[in-house]
Design a protein with these regions (language model features):
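Ser/Thr-rich, Pro/Gly/Ala-heavy low-complexity intrinsically disordered linkers and tails
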Residues: 179-200
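Beta-strand-centric surfaces of beta-sandwich/beta-rich domains
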Residues: 1-173
Length: 201
């Protein structure tokens, strides 16, 4: 199933006049296991570059950095054997780099402050890339295929796949079934308590 990332910030864009190397940041948390298939930075005139990071626990890894020119918006497609395979709960972080100076020929007048908006003279900050949602079984299968494709050996680090190093993971390790059962038990307990209270009345 196709998965869009909803990764960006259209409210807090504050680009100061006549200043280069300004940064914008946005985060999202993956609600399902995903295999990322594309990276598509979308900025406006001051945009110079965008980087995408994956954060899993205390592990932070840069997945992609790409230059940006608003005259030619590009989509970058990951090769199948390098596409990031990320577990549910991974934090995705994008950083946008802005140049609001005369050195940036796309900016009509760098003396002006710039905020958010849909016009080219205002700004957007979005990763429009997409991915594929993975079930628990598909997630484990994708990691095993990646290990075989790169001739993985114990101790090897796999860029963009924080759990690939654990070749003994099972569905129970990556599944939410235990959490769902616990939630169901809690709901049943609440219902039983309510029924008992009603009977006592």
């Amino acid at each position: 199933k196709r998965a869009s990332r909803s990764l960006g910030d259209g409210l807090n864009i504050d680009i100061r006049p006549e200043e280069a190397d300004q940064q914008l940041h946005a985060y999202t948390v993956l609600q399902t296991h995903q295999k990322l298939t594309t990276f598509e930075p979308h900025l406006h005139a001051p945009g110079q570059r965008m980087c995408l990071e994956a954060i899993w626990g205390n592990h932070i890894e840069t997945l992609t950095c790409a230059g940006y020119d608003h005259n030619w918006v590009r989509t970058y497609e990951y090769a199948d054997h390098t596409a990031p395979i990320l577990p549910k709960g991974t934090i995705l972080h994008i950083t946008g780099y802005m140049d609001n100076t005369t050195a940036n020929r796309n900016v009509p007048d760098p003396r002006n402050w710039q905020g958010s908006g849909n016009r080219s003279v205002t700004n957007m900050f979005i990763d429009l890339g997409i991915g594929v949602q993975l079930s628990d079984e598909q997630f484990l299968e994708q990691m095993e295929e990646r290990r075989q494709a790169i001739d993985w050996r114990l101790g090897d680090h796999v860029i963009g796949c924080p759990l690939c190093a654990y070749d003994d993971l099972t569905i129970a390790d990556v599944s939410d079934e235990d959490e769902d059962e616990a939630e169901d038990d809690a709901e049943d307990g609440t219902a039983d308590t309510a029924d008992t209270a009603a009977q006592q009345q």
